[in-house]
């Protein structure tokens, strides 16, 4: 599996996303196993245990921009029960949150505020872009709307829809958990390679292309 490597360099504060250098590398744990099978396997087990704890205890930051935020909060109600994924603990401060959901239209005036909130989050942290407006500007192709939050934030999961249903948000959360389970991060700030390795996850659109092509009976737009 290929990984995207982002170097952690505390002496270069100006090299932030999207300016920071990134490169595509192979799984670093495989290289460790080839060098020393015992230490490599031990590091693999420790990394898996840490990732298991991270992905099953994701605390979201209570933040929303537009109508997609209403659908996001619906996922916290009893019929959907987001507590199954360990993500029911909504945090009022970005310093206590693990991931941020950009739900709604991102205006240019809000972009610096969103970036400031993201920078206040502690590592490790992740971003979910929810809805067409957050993904690409949606129907607002105008000067005052940012055409995709990935212009200034590193997005981990994109949830399409206008607005997406709560089930779509939950699927995006599960995809984020899957990605976190395959991440490679340093176990401390002084031990190991100081870099963040994020797995290159396959696109759900490409994976389901053949399945969508085979569909012949389209559902009526009057049916929900």
UniProtKB/Swiss-Prot annotation:
UniProt feature, compositional bias: Basic and acidic residues: 203-212
Q: What class of enzyme is it?
A: translocase
| Oligomer status and interactors | NDH-1 is composed of 13 different subunits. Subunits NuoB, CD, E, F, and G constitute the peripheral sector of the complex.
Query: Which cysteine-cysteine pairs are annotated as disulfide bonds in the entry?
Result: none
Q: Which UniProt keywords apply?
A: 4Fe-4S, Cell inner membrane, Cell membrane, Iron, Iron-sulfur, Membrane, Metal-binding, NAD, Quinone, Translocase, Transport, Ubiquinone
UniProt-listed PROSITE patterns: COMPLEX1_20K
The entry's protein name is NADH-quinone oxidoreductase subunit B
Q: What does this protein do?
A: NDH-1 shuttles electrons from NADH, via FMN and iron-sulfur (Fe-S) centers, to quinones in the respiratory chain. The immediate electron acceptor for the enzyme in this species is believed to be ubiquinone. Couples the redox reaction to proton translocation (for every two electrons transferred, four hydrogen ions are translocated across the cytoplasmic membrane), and thus conserves the redox energy in a proton gradient.
Extent of the signal sequence: none
Q: Where is this region: Disordered?
A: 201-224
What are the recorded GO MF terms, alphabetically?
4 iron, 4 sulfur cluster binding; iron ion binding; NADH dehydrogenase (ubiquinone) activity; NADH:ubiquinone reductase (non-electrogenic) activity; quinone binding
Specify the taxonomic lineage: Bacteria, Pseudomonadati, Pseudomonadota, Gammaproteobacteria, Pseudomonadales
Using the UniProt record, give the first listed, main subcellular location: membrane
Instruction: Please tell me where [4Fe-4S] cluster binds in this chain.
Output: 67-68, 133, 162
Q: How is the cofactor bound?
A: Binds 1 [4Fe-4S] cluster.
Question: What does it catalyze?
Answer: a quinone + NADH + 5 H(+)(in) = a quinol + NAD(+) + 4 H(+)(out)
Membrane topology for this entry? Peripheral membrane protein
**GO CC term, one of those recorded:** plasma membrane
List locations, semicolon-separated.
Cell inner membrane
């Amino acid at each position: 599996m290929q990984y995207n490597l982002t170097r952690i360099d505390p002496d270069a504060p100006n090299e932030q996303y999207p300016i920071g250098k990134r490169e595509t590398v192979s799984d670093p744990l495989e290289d460790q196993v080839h060098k020393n099978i015992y230490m490599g396997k031990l590091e693999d087990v420790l990394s898996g245990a840490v990732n298991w704890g991270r992905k099953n205890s994701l605390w979201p930051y209570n933040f929303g921009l537009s109508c997609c935020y209403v659908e996001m909060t619906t996922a916290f109600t009893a019929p959907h029960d987001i507590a199954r994924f360990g993500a029911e603990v909504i945090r009022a401060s970005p310093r206590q949150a693990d991931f941020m959901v950009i739900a709604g239209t991102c205006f240019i005036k809000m972009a610096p505020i969103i970036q400031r909130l993201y920078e206040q989050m502690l590592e490790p942290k992740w971003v979910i872009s929810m809805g067409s407006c957050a993904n690409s500007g949606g129907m607002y192709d105008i000067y005052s709307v940012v055409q995709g939050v990935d212009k200034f934030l590193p997005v981990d999961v994109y949830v399409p829809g206008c607005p997406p249903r709560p089930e779509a948000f939950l699927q995006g959360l599960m995809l984020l958990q899957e990605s976190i389970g395959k991440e490679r991060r340093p176990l401390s700030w002084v031990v190991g390679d100081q870099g963040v390795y994020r797995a290159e996850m396959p696109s759900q659109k490409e994976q389901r292309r053949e399945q969508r092509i085979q569909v012949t009976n389209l559902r009526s737009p009057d049916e929900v």
